[in-house]
Amino acid sequence: MHTLHLIFEPRPKAPRLHALIVADAFQLPANPSRLLQTTKLECLAASMQRILSHYQPRVRTNHSVLSSRAVAQHLGSDNADPPRPETILYAQNHDPFGRKSSFLPRCADNGLCHADANPVSEVPESPPSTVKSSGDASVSDKDDDGLMDRCMLHDGAKGLLAVPRSKVQTSSGQVAETSPPQLSRKVIQNATSSSLYIKVERSKPSSRKRPSCIALETDEKASGPRIRARLGAKVQPSLGQVVEKFKRQATQHDTGSSMCIKPESARSKPIRRKRPAGAALETDEKASGPQTRARARAEASEASEASSPLPIARSARPYSAAEDDILQTLVARGLAWEEIEKEFGLRFAKRTMRSLQMRWSRKLKLTAPSTRCSKRKRSSASL
C-alpha cells in the first residue's frame, strides 16, 4: 500500500488536465491482459469545477510519488482486483492537519462519470518539496508538461498515475503494438479545462477478405466472436465443393470444345480446293512414277464418263491425220453417225458421236468434195 503526499499550489487560472494511463511508457507488465482489464474504466471522468474553486492542486511530474512502473506491477499482480465505481476517488488529501477532502462519482447513461465534490475543508498552501516513493524515484518540482491528476483505483490503494504529455502518445501506441491483436485497445484522451475523460475502446480486428465461394452467414449474428477452428471447419467443405465444381466445369468445357469448331482456328488455316472424287481415291499405284495433275484429271474424267449414262465432252485431245482420213471416208460412204462412231472406235481410241460431228463440221466438211456435185456428174455421164 502506498500513500500519496500531494502538493497543492494556488493557481489563478484553471489548470490543464492531462490524460492518465495505467501503463509504463517503456515496459509492460508480464500479463498484458490484466493491464487491459484494469484500464477498462468505464466510469473514470469527473468534473473538477467545484474542487478547483476551493483549491488548486498541482502535482509535478518530476515528483514521482509512485512510478508508473510500480503502478503497472501492482495492477498486473494476481492480488489486483478490478476497480469498482463506488471506490474511485479523485482527491484523497492527507495534509499535516489530518483533514481530508473527497468526493464520490455518479455515472450517467453514456458510461462516463461526473463527480460532485464535497470538500471537507480547504487545504492550506504548502511549499514545494521533493517526495520519494517506494520505487526510489525522486525528482525536482520543475515540469514543462503542466498539471497531472491522480486517482484511487482500489479501496485504500493510492497511486499517482501521472505521465507527461510527451509520453502519452508513445505509451498508448506501445500498448497497441506489443499486445496481441485480440486484446489491443486504444486509449483516447480528451482533456478539457473542467473534466477529465479516459475512454477505452476495443480496436476492430483486421478484416480479412473471405473467398468469394464462401456464402455470407447472415443467420448467425448473436453468437459472439467467431473462433478460428470453427471458421476452418466451415471453410474446408466449401473449398472441396468448389474444387469438384471446377473439375466438372473443366470436363464440360473440354467436351464442348471438342464438338464445335472455333472460328479462329478456321480462319488461321488456308482455304483448300476441293479435289475430284476420282483423284482423291488413289488406290492403284503404278510404277511409272508420281502422277501429274493432268493425268489425274484425265483418269477422273474417264471414270465419270463411264459411270454417267449421258455423253460428256472429253478434254481437248487433238485428232491425228489418220483419224481425219478415216472419218472422211466413213462420212463419204453415207453411214449413219452411230455406225461411224462404232467403226471409228474399233480402229482408234473411242470418240463420242458428238466429238466426231464437231470435228467433221468444223474441219473436214470444208475440205471434203461435195456429194451433190459428184451425183450431177454421175447423172450426166450416164446420159
From Swiss-Prot:
Domain Myb-like stretches: 318-364
Organism of this sequence: Aspergillus fumigatus (strain ATCC MYA-4609 / CBS 101355 / FGSC A1100 / Af293) (Neosartorya fumigata)
Location of the region described as Disordered in the Swiss-Prot/TrEMBL record: 118-145, 249-318
Matching InterPro entries: SANT/Myb (IPR001005)
Lineage of producing organism: Eukaryota, Fungi, Dikarya, Ascomycota, Pezizomycotina
GO BP: cell adhesion
Stimuli inducing this protein: Expression is regulated by the hypoxia responsive morphology factor A (hrmA).
Domain of life: Eukaryota
This protein's name: Subtelomeric hrmA-associated cluster protein AFUA_5G14865
UniProt KW keywords: Cell adhesion, Virulence
Protein purpose: Myb-like domain-containing protein; part of the subtelomeric hrmA-associated cluster (HAC) containing genes that alter the hyphal surface (such as reduced total chitin or increased beta-glucan exposure) and perturb inter-hyphal interactions within the developing biofilms, resulting in a loss of vertically aligned polarized growing filaments. Consequently, this hypoxia-typic morphotype (called H-MORPH) with altered biofilm architecture leads to increased hypoxia fitness, increased host inflammation, rapid disease progression, and mortality in a murine model of invasive aspergillosis.
Compositional bias (Low complexity): 119-134
Record-linked PROSITE patterns: MYB_LIKE (PS50090)
